[in-house]
């Protein structure tokens, strides 16, 4: 492989929930663009995958906005927000030799948010 491209949509490209429809449509467009680019760039040995992060708020949010922090921790089925190393693991996988036959996917890292 010569390279890897990773657009960054979000979980709202897979599910609407409470965000405005234009936000979800834009994120869904990135996911579709990932698939399209993967098909057309694969012959050139370029992989294209996306990662859709769920809630990964900064830890300082817990002190500044405790009500929002509590809400974000209740939304995912895992009942907690993500931590940076968990998102980094997905990025490292897609950038590593372990995923040289993976292209055109959208990998949600969201604690199960988009599973329901």
Question: PLM features: residue spans?
Answer:
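Short C-terminal tail/terminal secondary-structure segment
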Residues: 14-16, 92, 103-116
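Short-chain dehydrogenase/reductase
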Residues: 34-35, 88-91, 95
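Conserved internal alpha-helix within the Rossmann fold of NAD(P)-dependent oxidoreductases
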Residues: 4, 30-31, 80, 84, ...
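Conserved SDR Rossmann-fold cofactor-binding beta-strand/turn motif
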Residues: 47-57, 95, 108-110
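A glycine/serine/threonine-rich, flexible loop-to-helix segment
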Residues: 9-16, 43, 53-76, 86, ...
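Short, small/polar-rich loop/turn modules that mediate ligand/substrate recognition or access, typified
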Residues: 42, 47, 102-104
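Catalytic loop of short-chain dehydrogenase/reductase
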Residues: 1-29, 34-43, 55
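A conserved structural motif in NAD(P)-dependent oxidoreductases
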Residues: 76-87, 98
């Amino acid at each position: 492989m010569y390279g890897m491209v990773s657009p960054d949509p979000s979980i709202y490209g897979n599910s609407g929930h409470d965000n405005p429809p234009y936000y979800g449509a834009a994120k869904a467009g990135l996911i579709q663009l990932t698939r399209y680019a993967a098909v057309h760039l694969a012959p050139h040995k370029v992989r294209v995958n996306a990662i859709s992060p769920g809630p990964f708020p900064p830890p300082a949010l817990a002190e500044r906005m405790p009500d929002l922090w509590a809400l974000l921790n209740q939304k995912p089925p895992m009942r907690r927000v993500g931590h940076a190393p968990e998102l980094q693991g997905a990025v490292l996988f897609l950038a590593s030799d372990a995923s040289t036959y993976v292209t055109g996917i959208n990998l949600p890292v969201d604690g199960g948010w988009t599973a329901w």
